[in-house]
């Protein structure tokens, strides 16, 4: 999804597969794509050539972590799910000395799904339910004041999707597909979006972007298929209202495959204010022979219009950004793109055998979220390691820390 200007990145999914031995950089089951010989584009020289996710914490239950919030080196929160026949939400906290399980705040009520952690300012944290379809639970939020959890007195109405905070008095949230809610520190205000949106990026108080798709207007006409050809859509908030922004169309050549549609699923604001958007032009696969390949959409706002963004090399070609540090971009799938355009695969370790993972097991690391530790260039990630082995597969919730060099 998009970077937040406090150095917080929201990650849809980061996946990488560990082989049966070593920490290698194999990409066999990752879905990542590579070009050229032996990956010279993915193995640059210099300090960026060696990045590794190392285990910071391995939880003592079968399950996964779904979110993490890093308020300080000694104040880290993680939420996840324990799989013990029935799924149970779990809350973990690190106080600088050890990780401990904490009870979920009573303000949330009963919940099976792990809640989501939202950093809204300096050491300010909100805990909200997932959009699970339960209207009553959707409005039960909790807030952390540095000492205790309490009920949030004014949660946003509706069922919140994407959530972006530039500060405790400047918060945006998607409510359904075509409504945006804004918190000014006192109250929530709803505004109507021109089109359906799936993602938000906050550049500044009067500079907010939303992206999604539209089913009306130029490029949506499609003869003989009984439906519209959805097109990429983008919208901009200028401090007064949301306005539709002209967005390049995407369309397969004739014959158009079944149920073709195009849209933007991610908008990302760099630290320098540059805005990028990503999406796909796809269709319902398996209905015709000689199918075309899905098309990857990558756009950059040049200050007045959207222009096509140059593709990255090697395994970074179809990856989207999930975070930014001082030297480049973290991409989904555990890839890293340096500022000078080099593509690096982030390495990873295998679980120790003490966890029950056998030496011959197949292990895959899935990260749901990465965060910069405030005031540092250290990064933490949260997710799980899936261990596939005969008779005793399991999932280990993990927090990982990025190691540079060595």
Language-model-derived ranges and their functions:
Residues 1-36:
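Secretory targeting and sorting signals
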Residues 24-406:
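Residue-level hotspots at or immediately adjacent to binding/recognition sites across diverse folds
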């Amino acid at each position: 999804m998009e970077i937040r200007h406090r150095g917080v990145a929201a990650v849809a999914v980061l996946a990488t597969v560990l082989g049966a031995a070593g920490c290698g950089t194999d990409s066999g089951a990752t879905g990542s794509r590579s070009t050229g010989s032996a990956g010279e584009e993915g193995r640059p020289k210099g300090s960026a050539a060696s990045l590794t996710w190392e285990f910071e914490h391995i939880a003592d239950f079968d399950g996964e972590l779904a979110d993490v919030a890093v308020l300080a080196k000694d104040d880290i929160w993680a939420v996840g799910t324990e799989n013990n026949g029935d799924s149970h939400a779990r809350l973990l906290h690190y106080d600088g000395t050890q990780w401990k399980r904490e009870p979920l705040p009573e303000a949330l009520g009963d919940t099976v799904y792990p809640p989501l952690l939202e950093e809204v300012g300096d050491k300010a944290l909100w805990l909200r339910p997932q959009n699970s379809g339960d209207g009553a639970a959707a409005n039960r939020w909790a807030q952390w004041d540095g000492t205790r959890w309490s009920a949030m007195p004014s949660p946003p109405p509706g069922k919140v999707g994407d959530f972006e905070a530039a500060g405790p008095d400047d918060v945006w949230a998607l409510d359904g597909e075509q409504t945006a809610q804004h918190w000014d520190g006192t109250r929530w205000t709803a505004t109507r979006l021109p089109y359906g949106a799936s993602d938000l990026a906050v550049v500044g108080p009067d500079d907010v972007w939303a992206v999604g798709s539209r089913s009306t207007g130029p490029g949506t006409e499609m003869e003989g298929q009984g439906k519209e050809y959805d097109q990429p859509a983008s919208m901009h908030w200028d401090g007064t209202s949301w306005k539709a922004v002209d967005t390049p169309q995407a369309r397969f050549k004739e014959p158009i495959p079944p149920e073709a549609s195009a849209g933007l699923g991610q908008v990302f604001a760099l630290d320098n204010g540059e805005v990028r958007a990503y999406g796909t032009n796809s269709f319902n696969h398996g209905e015709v022979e000689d199918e075309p390949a899905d098309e990857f959409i990558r756009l950059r706002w040049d200050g007045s219009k959207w222009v096509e963004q140059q593709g990255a090399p090697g395994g970074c070609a179809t990856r989207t950004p999930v975070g930014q540090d001082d030297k480049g971009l973290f991409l989904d799938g555990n890839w890293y793109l340096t500022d000078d355009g080099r593509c690096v695969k982030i390495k990873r370790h295998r679980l120790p055998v003490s966890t029950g993972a056998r030496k011959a097991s197949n292990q895959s690391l899935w990260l749901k979220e990465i965060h910069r530790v405030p005031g540092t260039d250290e990064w933490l990630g949260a997710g799980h390691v899936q261990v596939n082995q005969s008779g005793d597969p399991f999932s280990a919730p993990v927090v990982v820390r990025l190691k540079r060099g060595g």
